Amino acid sequence: MDPSKDTSPQVRLEKITYNYPYSDAAALSDVNLELKKGEFVLLAGPSGCGKSTLVRCLNRLVPEVSGGSFSGRVLLRGKDLTHEKVHSLALEVGMVFQNPETQLFSLTVAEDLAFGPENLGLPGEEIRIRVKKVLKEVGLKGLEDHFIFTLSGGEKQRTAIGGNLAMQPEILVLDEPTSDLDPAGTGEVLELLKHLNAENRTTLILIEHKLDAVFEMVDRMLVMDEGRVILDGKPFEILCREEEKLRKLGIHPPQFTEIARFLGFFSENSSIPAYETLLKRLTELLQASEVEIHPEDLEKRESEIPAPAPQPRNTPPHVLIEQLCYRHEDGSEAFEKLNLEIKRGEFLALLGHNGAGKTTLAGHLIGFYRPASGRILLDGKDISGYSTARLSKQVGYLFQNPDSQIFTNSVFEEVCFGLENLGMPEEKIKKLADSALEMMELSAYRNRHPHALSRGQRQRLAVASILALEPDLLILDEPTTGQDRGHIRKFLDKIRKLNGLGKTVILITHDMELAAEYAERVVVMKQGKIFLDGPTAEVFSSPEELGAAGLLPPLPARLALDLRKLGIDIPRLLTVSDLKSFLKARCPELSACRPTEIEKIVEENDSGEEVSLF
């Protein structure tokens, strides 16, 4: 695919400015942009910067559905879309939203994939061919007759993508399509997008916070802030040369580019190095150094989890699950004699492939599900007879979809709602609500309607509502969906402080980097069973077992494993900070070097002889 061969823009945006109803702040401000046919564009930026608003202009959802004040023009192949209707653009611009449930209409997977083509009046045989093709492309073959409500979040997301692909649009917009997918599922979807772009020349616009997964496969990167496009260029150039600006926006560079930059890659005319090249640079750097390293030489991990407060002897575990059995409504087995023990004050990451049973297991702790047999104890007390309302005083649960637990007319009212139901005095309610809003950086939006917030901001609002209730056990079910890295880390840093005060945290996530950085213990589920359970470093040192569960260790852990296979004496590493600290202690000269000078360190061994770098 060579987008440069097609010089005429497929899409042109001219001076687009837009305000949502009842909002004085512009969601988009004087945006000018051209896209060529066949481009694969990554659209990045902090939560609430206008990314989703911008792409919704392409099929007239903004302002046709959203209302508000709109000025400027959107042209598709030179045609002004000002007077076009949303439905008339469905064949030209497909859109996959952050929340797949907003665009799933049918009972089964196959019926939903057929929904669009049926509305086009296509012959039955053509519809069947399209559905069969899409089922294979999005990895849902075998699930065609499954009811939508029985699917995991990731399976629903792939169904939504498939429904768009069945329409065969020229432009496909994907608003965080991998947010609910495990690493294996993310890889499958991104490979699919890569194939569509390369083989069909489908123009792709991808909004994504998972930069590690996508930066190498896109042609172009756009960065937005406060309703404007502020950066536009090749991904690796922006990620390396504008790192300081990106960090200020809460956009952290991919682990790969951060490590490569630290090792001296990305000079003026360099390109993205391969993983093997990165590994070779590390090998030669470490072989050239014979400095003896002591544990005390390593800098303290920035991500180090505070040790839980010591527990008195004979204190029961905070959570004890014994012989838990549960079946779904369709009769399929979720768990069979599952056992799990969680100590008070632990920070536990619950990982696993889509459909492994993570959310179903966590839902038992708040009373959303009732086991067929077995029992669950909180602080030594059997909760089988407890209502969800009673459990909510002890257990705070954040859903994957924040809209499932937001229903008032203002941000402040939302945080106060649970407190009012507990009958607290008004003064205490206000104090707790203000504190929770400040913690989640939402004080400035206290009078705004929740649905005028971005998805990431609504996610933080749901968390604020939970934190105001001060539960002892926090269950965070994919809390990072729709948020930029800066907000994610600020949020999890605050959760970690609560954990340090003794609160137990269960983090359900597909983000291996965050699990490695924040959790002290990792539990991996596979097909309704506990597959791996242990300290984070130990679990992430088992790549084969993780791969069998559809997971992949974070990059520093993989590098450390491969270096040990090459005979390098290196400890288990989990984060980029771990790797940098180790390298600085092992190779003190790195601390004083600029990134582009580091390659000179490995050019000579002890005898002064040159060694081959690549």
From Swiss-Prot:
Repeat keyword on record: yes
One of the record's GO cellular component terms: ATP-binding cassette (ABC) transporter complex
Keyword set includes Mitochondrion: no
Chain positions recorded as ATP 1 binding sites: G45, P46, S47, G48, C49, G50, K51, S52
Domain ABC transporter: 11-251, 319-552
Gene3D superfamilies (alphabetical): P-loop containing nucleotide triphosphate hydrolases
This protein's UniProt keywords: ATP-binding, Cell membrane, Membrane, Nucleotide-binding, Repeat, Translocase, Transport
Matching Pfam families: ABC_tran (PF00005)
Subcellular location(s) per record: Cell membrane
Transmembrane segments: none
PROSITE patterns tied to this protein: ABC_TRANSPORTER_2 (PS50893)
Protein purpose: Probably part of an ABC transporter complex. Responsible for energy coupling to the transport system.
Protein name from the UniProt record: Putative ABC transporter ATP-binding protein MA_1747
Organism: Methanosarcina acetivorans (strain ATCC 35395 / DSM 2834 / JCM 12185 / C2A)
